[in-house]
Amino acid sequence: MQAPKHHRRLFAVLATLNTATAVIAGCSSGSNLSSGPLPDATTWVKQATDITKNVTSAHLVLSVNGKITGLPVKTLTGDLTTHPNTVASGNATITLDGADLNANFVVVDGELYATLTPSKWSDFGKASDIYDVASILNPDAGLANVLANFTGAKTEGRDSINGQSAVRISGNVSADAVNKIAPPFNATQPMPATVWIQETGDHQLAQIRIDNKSSGNSVQMTLSNWDEPVQVTKPQVS
């Protein structure tokens, strides 16, 4: 059945982050990390930008710290692929009328499905009418664009992200790039951000946090399973 319009508006926000994942993934420093010289920040951000432009699937963990107007998502978990077709699935905790709501979601065949009631799937119509879930992997509007517009890069140290050593780099992201990937921020000037880039392999983007210093809010996304297959089953609508 088709979901009510007020629920569609709610999931317009949920779908903007359809590319995300489950438990809040943090980072930790440890003595097992390399103690060698830190790499050049600008070079590594450029390498991560080039790699991210070609990523077609990923597992993401998203967490929102604080309250952001128009963004009732607290945590979101899921997998996304844009090749050969765009599909996504996951789970989110959202705040509705002051209460936390846990919902599963699926995007398949261009349709957005979700469970606002446990085990009861509803069809929210065309995902593209609510939000283009593929945008986070869009090289012109997603994470690659954020990295391409990352300025003032400075290496800060090393942390462990999902058990992998990553170099922590601080800088700023242009307002336009922020608003493309996180419209509720309504950025009017560059925003402080921190990226964690894997120290081994292809130097994949392992984590990013965008901070709104004026409000004290932030959005953090942690990535893994780059370019691994994603399988999604179309749910049975109640």
Curated annotation (Swiss-Prot):
Q: Which Pfam families match?
A: LppX_LprAFG
Q: Where is the lipid attached (S-diacylglycerol cysteine)?
A: C27
Q: Which GO terms describe its biological process?
A: lipid transport
Lipid (N-palmitoyl cysteine) linked to which residue positions?
C27
| UniProt GO cellular component terms | extracellular region; plasma membrane
Q: Which GO molecular function entries does the Swiss-Prot or TrEMBL record give?
A: lipid binding
Major localization listed first in the record, in broad terms: membrane
Enumerate the subcellular locations listed in this protein's record, separating them with semicolons: Cell inner membrane; Secreted, Cell wall; Secreted
UniProt membrane topology term: Lipid-anchor
Q: Which UniProt keywords apply?
A: Cell inner membrane, Cell membrane, Cell wall, Glycoprotein, Lipid transport, Lipid-binding, Lipoprotein, Membrane, Palmitate, Secreted, Signal, Transport
Q: Superkingdom of this entry's organism?
A: Bacteria
Q: Where is the signal peptide?
A: 1-26
Q: Name the InterPro entries on file.
A: LolA/LolB/LppX (IPR029046), LppX/LprAFG (IPR009830)
- Whether Cytoplasm counts among this entry's keywords is no
Domain notes, please?
Forms a U-shaped beta-half-barrel with a small hydrophobic cavity able to hold a triacylated lipid or triacylglyceride. A flexible lid region may move to accommodate different TAG molecules.
- Function field: Helps membrane protein ML0556 (P55) transport triacylglycerides (TAG) across the inner cell membrane into the periplasm and probably ultimately to the outer membrane. Binds TAG in its hydrophobic cavity and transfers it between lipid bilayers. TAG probably regulates lipid metabolism and growth regulation and plays a structural role in the outer membrane. Binds di- and triacylated phosphatidyl-myo-inositol mannosides (PIMs), and glycolipid lipoglycan modulins lipoarabinomannan (LAM) and lipomannan (LM), facilitating their recognition by TLR2. Constitutes a host TLR2 agonist (toll-like receptor) able to stimulate proliferation of CD4+ T-cells derived from a human leprosy patient following protein processing/presentation by MHC class II molecules in peripheral blood mononuclear cells.
Q: Anything else of interest in the record?
A: Bacterial LAM blocks host cell phagosome-lysosome fusion and is one way in which Mycobacteria evade the host immune system.
Would you identify the family this protein belongs to, as annotated? Belongs to the LppX/LprAFG lipoprotein family.
Protein name as catalogued: Lipoarabinomannan carrier protein LprG
Q: Which organism is it from?
A: Mycobacterium leprae (strain TN)
